[in-house]
Amino acid sequence: MNSNYLLLPHFDPSIFTLGDSNIGLRWYGLMYLLGFVFARWLAVRRANRPNSGWTVDQVDTLLFNGFMGVFIGGRVGDVFFYNLDHFLQEPLYLFRVWEGGMSFHGGLIGVIVAMIWTSYSQKRNFWQTADFVAPLIPFGLGLGRIGNFINLELWGRETNVPWAMIFPNDPLLLPRHPSQLYEAFLEGLVLFAILNIFIKKPRPMASVAGLFLIGYGVFRFIVEYVREPEVENFFGIITRGQALCLPMIIGGAFIMAWAYSRKSAVIK
């Protein structure tokens, strides 16, 4: 082991547990909770602006549905995208949520389903809902990556950069990229800033959602080059995460082009 690199302490992933059980509050769960609290604060603030088109009750319904979408979609996505073999051998693994395992792409699918249902029940345009939700997401994503870092999971590839870190649960104790922190910065702070600056200017409906898909897809695709793959690469070229990001980037670009082609639907 090279002493020139920072050796991280072994963080306890649980803040507390109930007795000898595995049930309790984990840092990762706390990050999700803080992300939703911040999202509600920001959403209510925007809903209270004149002519926002939203009431606080509608926001709460949307966020509750979104929370369920993230939780169910994130868990199912992690199992089917990254741990399908484990699930086929032990189907009850899907329900052991206290062991961790959440997929962003699965959570995104869950949120989209929740937005479709909420838009239908509130009789509003889906893209109005998607544009309202998109700027709320990145801050929570960043906190989630901090949770990954505390859990000492999803670390990066081996490297010799000066800021490399050694994760104590790495059997090889190699200096690695702190890829969780890269993602927290790019997918969290940077994407949050981009979207919340973008919505301050006139723009066509659906453009905010399209920009979110492009921004997340590009940032995640880049970081995947220094993140240790969870599963084998596709054809030895790209990782599973990069393969899942490509449809996001392409879809986001298509949505942006379509949105700007509809010149009459400009939101000020």
UniProtKB/Swiss-Prot annotation:
Gene Ontology CC: plasma membrane
Q: Which UniProt keywords apply?
A: Cell inner membrane, Cell membrane, Membrane, Transferase, Transmembrane, Transmembrane helix
> Entry's NCBIfam families?
lgt
Q: Where in the cell is it found?
A: Cell inner membrane
Q: What is the organism field in this record?
A: Haemophilus influenzae (strain 86-028NP)
Q: Extract the GO molecular function terms from the UniProt entry.
A: phosphatidylglycerol-prolipoprotein diacylglyceryl transferase activity
What is its EC class?
Answer: transferase
Q: What topology does the record note for this protein and the membrane?
A: Multi-pass membrane protein
Q: Which biological processes are named by the entry's GO terms?
A: lipoprotein biosynthetic process
Q: Which residues bind a 1,2-diacyl-sn-glycero-3-phospho-(1'-sn-glycerol)?
A: 145
Q: What does this protein do?
A: Catalyzes the transfer of the diacylglyceryl group from phosphatidylglycerol to the sulfhydryl group of the N-terminal cysteine of a prolipoprotein, the first step in the formation of mature lipoproteins.
Q: Which Pfam families match?
A: LGT
Predominantly, its location class is membrane
Entry's transmembrane regions: 23-43, 62-82, 97-117, 132-152, 179-199, 206-226, 241-261
Query: Its Enzyme Commission number?
Result: 2.5.1.145
Q: In which pathway does it act?
A: Protein modification; lipoprotein biosynthesis (diacylglyceryl transfer)
Name the protein family.
Belongs to the Lgt family.
Please identify the protein, giving its name as recorded.
Phosphatidylglycerol--prolipoprotein diacylglyceryl transferase
